[in-house]
Amino acid sequence: DQYLEHEDRIVARREKDLAAHKERLARQAARLTEVLSALGARRVWVFGSFARGHVRSDSDLDMAVEGLPYSQDQLLGIAERSLGGGLTLDLVPWEAASALLRERILSEGRVLYEREE
């Protein structure tokens, strides 16, 4: 009986930690979308496990941005300065993405921002 109670506490703690991780990723996505749109992005997507709703405790945030004249390293630097430490992010410039990655972004991704033309 004590063993089951202990297991229940472990499961509850893991669920709480996972919920906190999902919330942290959601805040990062929202904040970074604000920053990228202010810089003039045409479109911002989230894709990967977060977009599919399959977040694990080790999941990172996969995002793509269209319409900015920055390399992936420059975009990650912008993200780091905007979000601070503890960054769990892969930020891809749409223009540099392979055809396969673009297909993945379009099929599983969610548009977080799209500039009105």
What spans do the regions from the language model cover?
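Catalytic core of pol beta-like nucleotidyltransferases
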Residues: 1-45, 52-57, 68-117
